[in-house]
Design a protein with these regions (language model features):
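Short glycine-rich, low-complexity/disordered patches
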Residues: 25, 42-55, 114-151
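Short, solvent-exposed mixed-charge patches
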Residues: 176-178
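Short, exposed beta-strand-loop hairpins at the edges of beta-sheets
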Residues: 149-168
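Short helix/turn-capping signatures at newly exposed starts of structured segments
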Residues: 18-63, 75-85, 96-103
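Long, charged/polar, surface-exposed segments that mediate recognition or autoinhibition
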Residues: 73, 77-138
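Bacterial N-terminal signal peptides
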Residues: 5-16
Length: 178
């Protein structure tokens, strides 16, 4: 009979550890902002509080992201925890803007997940290649909504998404809180 309470203690310990490890996969918002500014210094990334009009009460802070390139985005934080990052690029885009979008996406991966430059660049390029291929296939099929979408799931409950359409591109990192 003594084993039953011990089993509950062990299960409770592992249950308490799992959410902590998922949440620790991403850094806090302040750390993300500083690291992204450093990683994408040449893009002159700037953050400003977004104006949100809503009747619903929210514990989220939303920031608009601007760069000196034609790339913008949003950052959503909850209780100083990273919740969501999105980068946007309008199409048709110049080669310079496309490069800036890819660089900002890779820099966000480094800032959010602590990946090295090679891993983050490879992940961003692999997702971009898939999205381009899926967009071409969507056009060939004559889909009603023409888009190339791809997503990846990384440890800690974090999801990565990339979507290409004829009018824009969007890259997202979504934390386990979202």
């Amino acid at each position: 009979m003594r084993l039953l309470p011990l089993a509950f203690v062990v299960m409770a310990m592992f249950g308490a550890v799992a959410p902590a490890s998922a949440a620790s996969a991403l850094m806090g918002c302040d750390a993300f902002v500083e690291k992204l500014r450093a990683e994408a210094r040449d893009l002159q990334v700037d953050f400003s509080h977004a104006l949100i009009v809503s009747r619903a009460r929210s514990d989220s802070e939303v920031f608009d992201i601007t760069t000196k390139a034609e790339v913008d985005g949003t950052l959503t934080c909850r209780h100083d925890g990273f919740a969501r990052f999105e980068a946007h690029l309008a199409e048709p885009a110049t080669a310079r803007a496309t490069t800036a979008f890819e660089r900002l996406s890779a820099a966000a991966l480094r800032a959010a997940l602590g990946w090295d430059a090679g891993k983050s660049r490879a992940q961003a390029q692999a997702m971009a290649s898939d999205a381009k291929e899926f967009l071409a296939a969507s056009r060939e099929r004559g889909d009603v909504y023409v888009a190339g979408k791809t997503e990846e799931h990384v440890p800690g409950g974090v999801s990565l998404g990339l979507i290409y359409t004829d009018v824009d591109r969007a890259f997202a990192i979504v934390g386990p809180q979202e």
